């Protein structure tokens, strides 16, 4: 994969060509100052100072919070202001019907949906958007290493970032599909929501494949600049399909129910179609660990052996006093 393949999947690169078959969207260029703000640690929303919350119902913590609030330097964090972007976001939200779905050039902050009040990416104000962007590791990777998997990757980074606001759609996850195009041929279709089993998908395989193939051949085929790529599509009940997004063909794009070695097989006799076959075949969602502290993720996955050793040592220290008392008794 080359950097140009990634650039071709940049939203503003493909949207003008496919705007008639995708969701209505607005593109807002981001200033360097705003991008730097997104890269900084911590979640301080623009517009007003961020005060530490009062935990009045928690008596055990009340004294601690009171001490913090009495110190102005600890109680209030100066918030940045981006009035121009703020105004553009408000105008775009109004033009798009009052509710939007945010993303940057390539990715949406799906891993941060847990922090919103309804566990979705539905946003009604600039503050909703800022909170999701600042809470997302996915967005951080887009900003810092968009070309990390490219064979012609260099020290030069992408420096033109955009906020994309898409008109909010109530999408039924079962009808989202990821489609794989190799050498200008649609070779595979995967269920997008692999963390759930939908019994009717396998039963309607022929209809689903026919509708998506027709959409590809009539609306997308040979119109995208690359010969191999991935696109996501939403299928409605009336055979209509809507384009959701484009992604590069290969890592880091998630092949979902396929593997890249399987998709790269020289001969693909027929269009491959995969869905979760039963409740037993359900896989964890790609952001299942996003709600856990990183230390907990490292412990459970074995990613950091040192943390696991420390954890076991602490456990031994905790048990020793009890064990000694048992022996004494």
UniProtKB/Swiss-Prot annotation:
Q: Which UniProt keywords apply?
A: Cell cycle, Cell division, Cytoplasm
| Function comment | Required for S phase entry of the cell cycle.
Query: What gene name does this entry carry?
Result: cdc123
Q: Where in the cell is it found?
A: Cytoplasm
User: Cytoplasm as a keyword?
Assistant: yes
User: Where primarily located?
Assistant: cytoplasm
In the UniProt record, which is one GO cellular component term? cytoplasm
Q: What is this protein called?
A: Cell division cycle protein 123 homolog
Q: Identify the stretch(es) annotated as Disordered.
A: 46-76
**Keyword Glycosyltransferase attached:** no
Q: Name one GO biological process term.
A: cell division
- Composition bias, kind Acidic residues: at what positions? 58-73
What span is annotated as the signal peptide, if there is one? none
User: In which family does this protein belong, per the annotation?
Assistant: Belongs to the CDC123 family.
